[in-house]
Regions:
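Membrane-embedded alpha-helical bundles that constitute the cytochrome b-like, heme-associated redox core
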Residues: 1-189
Length: 189
């Protein structure tokens, strides 16, 4: 028997094989980003770790999203200017990075190190691995993807082959502090 109840052992085993292959792919993706684009990763982390007054003030009205999309008059109307990432992005991306690192470590420990862990440690790693994956999946499904779709310019930047640039105008609207401090406008003649 398996923990999923209604499926056959063969199906459960096949799902576990797929799980391990996808885990290996996620591991290669994350580790590859750090190893093959360390400067890009460092810049991303620098931008995520810079919390100023405006970052904190973003949470007073959650960037105006409740007012704009749900007509809920939450907090002040004014959204303070943000850097490369707004307060919500900084918080969620830091959670994503920590959770992905945790899921990678616990996943490999559960798969390769199971005989060495002992029942209690295995149990708690398993529980936190499962719940961590549920939390990350919920964040991606309920917040990250819907909010990315609200900004088509950013959404197109994600899927564009190459650097994933966005227009100067989109950056000016969403990230004015970052634009003023870090971005050089190139004017083509």
């Amino acid at each position: 028997g398996n923990m999923m109840g209604a499926i056959s052992d063969e199906t459960a085993n096949l799902l576990m094989v797929w799980h391990i292959w996808l885990g290996a792919l996620f591991t290669l993706n994350f580790v590859g980003y750090i190893l093959f684009a360390p400067d890009r990763f460092a810049v991303t982390m620098k931008n995520l770790m810079e919390w100023d007054k405006n970052t904190i003030m973003w949470f007073r009205n959650f960037g105006g999203y409740p007012r704009r999309f749900f007509k809920i008059p939450f907090g002040p109307e004014e959204v303070p200017p943000q850097g490369r990432y707004n307060g919500g992005q900084k918080m969620s991306y830091l959670i994503f990075i920590a959770a992905i690192a945790y899921l990678i470590v616990t996943g490999w420990l559960l798969w390769a190190g199971a005989p060495l862990l002992g029942k209690t440690l295995f149990y708690w790693l398993f529980i936190t691995h499962v719940w961590g994956s549920i939390v990350v999946t919920a964040m991606v499904t309920c917040a990250h993807i819907p909010l990315a779709l609200l900004s088509m310019e950013h959404f197109k930047g994600i899927w564009r082959v190459g650097p994933g640039d966005i227009s100067y105008e989109a950056a000016e609207h969403h990230s004015p502090t970052w634009l003023k401090r870090d971005v050089v406008k190139v004017v083509e003649k």
